[in-house]
Each structure stands twice: as C-alpha cells, then as structure tokens.
Amino acid sequence: MSADALKDVIGGGKDLYALLEVSISSPEELEAVDAAQLRAQFRRLALRYHPDKRRDDTQQNDKFVSVQKAYDILSNSSLRATYNRWLSCRLFGDPERRRLVRELHQREQLQVRQKEPMDKDIQNIQSYGQLLRKMRHLRIPYGDWRPNTSISRDSTLVETCTLRLLLRQNSTTNSKSSMLQLFQRAKLHIVDLYFSSRNVDTENDLVLYAVMPDVDTMLDLLNNWAVKPPLSEHILQVQPRVHTDYFHFKTDISLDKTITEAIDADNQYMSSF
C-alpha cells in the first residue's frame, strides 16, 4: 500500500480502525492495538463481506474493498505510525479546532462530489467530439475507422466466458478432477476450473469458477444448467463472473454549452456541401 493511498485516506478523514470495528476511545488504546488484533478483525470482516458470498449486494462489496484498504494500511508499520499521529490529533486534539476542520472538510467534499463527475464526463465527450471532427475534416468515413490499439481476444474472453457456480459442498464438488468429469459427461468443454479462495469447509456450499472456450458454450451452461445431469444435481446457482449491474449507467448529464456549439458548427459545415 503506497503513501498516496494513505494521503487519500487522511484527506478523506477516514477512521480505518472504525472500518475494522476496533474501538478507540483514548490515545493509549490507539497505541495498544497490535497486529494480531488487526489481522483477526480483518479475517472476520473479510469472510462477512467478501463478494463471493454477497455477489449481488454492491453495498457489501464496497464494504469489503474499504476493509481491505484499511487493513493494508494499518498492517504497514510505517504507514500506520503516520496515520496514528494524524488520527490521534483528529480524535483527541482541541475540540473547537476539530469542529472547524470537520465542517471545512465537509464543505470541500460536497464541492468535489458536485463537480468531478460532470467534469470527467464532459472531458470524455469533448475528446470524442474532437476525434469525430478530425475524421470529418480528413474525409474518413466513420464506418472505416478502427481502433489503433491491439487487445488480445483471449484475454477479453476469459472475463466474458467465465461463470460463477454455487455448488452443494460434498466430496465430489470439492475435487477438481471429479468436477471435470461431470462437465465431460454433460458434454461441456472447459478451459479451466478454479475454486474461490474464500470457500469454507464448514459451510454447505462453495463457489467454483468455470472458464468456457467461447460465448456459445458459456450461454449454454448459463441458460440450460438445470437440464444437464449429473452436473445439475450439484449446482445451486450459475451466474456470470462479471455481473451485468456493473454496466448499468443511471446518471443523465446535460451537454456542456461548448459541446452543443461544436455540434451546431459541424451541422452548419456539413450543410454547406
């Protein structure tokens, strides 16, 4: 974990100990927290919030990321010493100064939240508009344009064609070789199988990831797993590894005035031909 991450945490006024559910009420308690206590809290919370167990709950997934970041910083002795000095001053310093700093920070954060999303989207739209205007000026048909970057088809399909299987935990599903045999009997070709690192032996289910060779095979298993015995006898649920909710955009942003003016100028230019 880098010093930049620590700077962001301090700038955001975050209490990392509170994220790990470690109670701090005095400077002495702050210094008394040891690595073993932090590690135990992280493991407990990681099991509670890990995405493998709460895949559809984005709030819980965000909580897991916050817990991971908190532990990464506090488990680094150098970063933790710097953070503890800041937190001690924030929690146990002058009350009036803390109140003023907190109010100032809240106002700054509100201004950032209101400005940043629109600025970022507008920059992207403006850059895209500049590209289109260059193509039009050079008389390059839009349909002839190709990206100038090379992306491996195999690397993108690994994400697209990976399914998350929730299985009943038993001697068969705990064995990769046994699961490969079940896929073969179901006439499903598999590129790879791997278990989630967060599976727990004492639970009734476990998570297995199946990498399919192509989209058609992936969709076949995703949509028809219930009619593929004997594999289906062990499956509780099948989902894409990359959840489709990540591709939903719910915010509508009005175009910047400079963009609408550029569009009008382009329309006037084209109408002159």
Swiss-Prot record:
The lineage of its organism: Eukaryota, Fungi, Dikarya, Ascomycota, Saccharomycotina. It is found in: Cytoplasm; Nucleus. Involved in pre-mRNA splicing. May be involved in endoplasmic reticulum-associated protein degradation (ERAD) and required for growth at low and high temperatures. Gene3D superfamilies: DnaJ domain (1.10.287.110). One of its GO terms (molecular function) is misfolded protein binding. GO terms for biological process: ERAD pathway; mRNA processing; RNA splicing. GO terms for cellular component: endoplasmic reticulum; spliceosomal complex. Residues 15-87 form the J domain. Its main location: cytoplasm. SUPFAM superfamilies: Chaperone J-domain. Keywords: Chaperone, Cytoplasm, mRNA processing, mRNA splicing, Nucleus, Spliceosome. Associated with the spliceosome. Belongs to the DnaJ family. InterPro entries: DnaJ_domain, DnaJ_domain_CS, Hsp70_co-chaperone_J-domain, J_dom_sf. Pfam families: DnaJ (PF00226). This is Pre-mRNA-splicing factor CWC23.
